[in-house]
Amino acid sequence: MSGLRPAISTFIFLLLITGGVYPLLTTVLGQWWFPWQANGSLIREGDTVRGSALIGQNFTDNGYFQGRPSATAEMPYNPQASGGSNLAVSNPELDKQIAARVAALRAANPDTSTSVPAELVTASASGLDNNITPQAAAWQIPRVAKARNLSVEQLTQLIAKYSQQPLVKYIGQPVVNIVELNLALDKLDE
């Protein structure tokens, strides 16, 4: 019985620290130092939430830039079912999916002569990725320009404006947040 008392007191102590103090402390510090990030990095227009800067959306209209395909269950970009397709590179099903995506992108982008960027036909590990490279966004410019009656130059400048450089210059590559880019496109129409 004497060995049980230290075990119980250690359990209660660790329960209070890891189940109470630590979560409360990280929540308070997160809200204090990083309130936007701690609340989901929500993009708002007035009182309306238009999306999150962290989660992609399923843009299918020709007037919008499209992000990476989503492999989430039930519906594209479902944040409650985050995950990749888990298909191996050697899996024939993955080849079929990629071929179908390439064909769909070619059909939607007939004015683009270069090859389809790989990131536009392969899902990310989370299935929720909202970033693509500026080159993948630029590949879609002819379609978006035609659908929105905008110039190639306007869209090129918009992509440059919304391109984000990596935190460390030589690690990573520039990316464009598709949700923010498409919301900026909507503002051009206003």
Curated annotation (Swiss-Prot):
Q: What is its main location?
A: membrane
Q: Which domain of life is it from?
A: Bacteria
Transmembrane portions of the chain = 10-30
| InterPro entries in UniProt | KdpC (IPR003820)
Tell me the Pfam families matching this sequence.
Answer: KdpC
Q: How does it sit in the membrane?
A: Single-pass membrane protein
State where the protein is found: Cell inner membrane
- The signal peptide stretch is none
Keywords for this protein: ATP-binding, Cell inner membrane, Cell membrane, Ion transport, Membrane, Nucleotide-binding, Potassium, Potassium transport, Transmembrane, Transmembrane helix, Transport
Q: Spell out the molecular function terms from Gene Ontology.
A: ATP binding; P-type potassium transmembrane transporter activity
Q: State any GO CC term.
A: plasma membrane
Write out the similarity annotation: Belongs to the KdpC family.
UniProt subunit comment: The system is composed of three essential subunits: KdpA, KdpB and KdpC.
Job of this protein: Part of the high-affinity ATP-driven potassium transport (or Kdp) system, which catalyzes the hydrolysis of ATP coupled with the electrogenic transport of potassium into the cytoplasm. This subunit acts as a catalytic chaperone that increases the ATP-binding affinity of the ATP-hydrolyzing subunit KdpB by the formation of a transient KdpB/KdpC/ATP ternary complex.
Q: Which NCBIfam families match?
A: kdpC, PRK00315.1
State what protein this is by name: Potassium-transporting ATPase KdpC subunit
What is the species listed in this Swiss-Prot or TrEMBL entry?
Shigella dysenteriae serotype 1 (strain Sd197)
